[in-house]
Every structure is written in C-alpha cells, then in structure tokens.
Amino acid sequence: MITNAISKIIKYDFKNTQLLNEALTHPSVLSKDNNNFNYERLEFLGDAVLNLVVSEMLFNIFPYDTEGNLAKKKTALVCGTKLVEIAQSINLGIFIIMSDGERSCGGANNSNNLENALEALIGAIYLDGGLKAAKDFIFLFWKNSATHMKVPPQDAKTILQEWAQSKGFPAPSYHIINKSGPDHNPCFTVEVRINSHETLHATGHNKKLAEQKAASLMLAKINYKIK
C-alpha cells in the first residue's frame, strides 16, 4: 500500500490516513464530495511550520550568528530548490495522486508539484502528530544541510542572476502576471524568464517572495544545486 510505503520512507505512521491522502492529492483531481480535497490548504500550513522549525533549528545550531546570517541560511533551506531536492530524495513524485493529463505532462517530476506536496506533507504530519512529529520529520531531512552551512548563502535571485551572467545571458526578468486575494492578504503570481529557457510561475504573499520562489524553481529547472 502507498501509505505503508511512504511511511517507511518518512519514518512516520499516520493515525489519520485521510490527511496523508489529502497531502498527496494534486488539484487536478476533482472530488465529487469536496472540491477542496487537495494539497493546497495543507501546503499553506506546512510552509508556516517549516519556516518555524527551520528558524528554531538554525537559532540553536548557530548561537553566534547575526540575524542577517540566520535569515540567509533559512532562505536557502526553505527555498524551492531545496524542497525539490528533498522531495526527489524520497521519490515523492511517485506518490502524488494526479489526473492522467497532469501525469502525462510530467507532473510527477514537476518542480512546483514536488515543492507543494512536500510542504503539504509537513502540514499533514503537524495536524496528525503535532509539532513534535513535524519537527522530527524536518530534522530528519534538513538538519544535515543546516549543520554543514559554513558561509551564509546568497538568495535565489542573486544566484540565478550570477549563473546567467556566467553563461553570457541577459539578467532574468520578473513580471507580475496576476494578483488575487484581499488587500490584507494578497497573492502575487510572478513569471520569470531567462534567455531561451521556458518561463516559470510562482506565487507568494508579496512580490519579493514570489520572485524568490520563481528564481528557486528556475534554479531547480536548470539543475543548479545550492550548497
């Protein structure tokens, strides 16, 4: 069974397997009973839990780091590139439930799908087992990278721009293609384009965050690994 297979990989057994199913369900799957039965809500929660746990982890690992250095390290550990890297390491794509159309278009290997499903999985673990369970999962897959961070890494946009310059390409361009939600909680969709590479989209609660996430996805697309 899928539940048993993924539980062995993530070292966590769900008490409520419905939460796991929801975390692994892509929005392309339409439910007759609940149109919201997909990973989007859990992704929202998981993103917040991941940021909290990684922040505390870095705070304890690096007691003498400045706020600025801690922030840079956290950015590298929660960026799209790192999420995709971890999702691929546990073969998360093969467990994502999606429509035949989405799968035939490479949905199981799509960076955005992997990133979203991993955050949703964290959210599901948090709801099922509490903060302790979520921390155990995050420590299992993130602590090694956090511990071996020697120099504060650059943000994804800076890394992408330097990569483009090293290839003789023009600087990446970012454009807001959609803004939705209420004024107090907006959601921006940003498109990034670089040379001949396809455009990629990412969303965030502000323009800066959406651009960083788009840059992270592009780095994952070109197989650039943040050390």
From Swiss-Prot:
Disulfide bonds: none annotated. Its EC number is 3.1.26.3. It is found in: Cytoplasm. Mg(2+) binds at residues 43, 116, 119. InterPro entries: dsRBD_dom (IPR014720), RNase_III (IPR011907), RNase_III_dom (IPR000999), RNase_III_sf (IPR036389). It catalyses: Endonucleolytic cleavage to 5'-phosphomonoester. Digests double-stranded RNA. Involved in the processing of primary rRNA transcript to yield the immediate precursors to the large and small rRNAs (23S and 16S). Processes some mRNAs, and tRNAs when they are encoded in the rRNA operon. Processes pre-crRNA and tracrRNA of type II CRISPR loci if present in the organism. This is Ribonuclease 3. It comes from Ehrlichia ruminantium (strain Gardel).
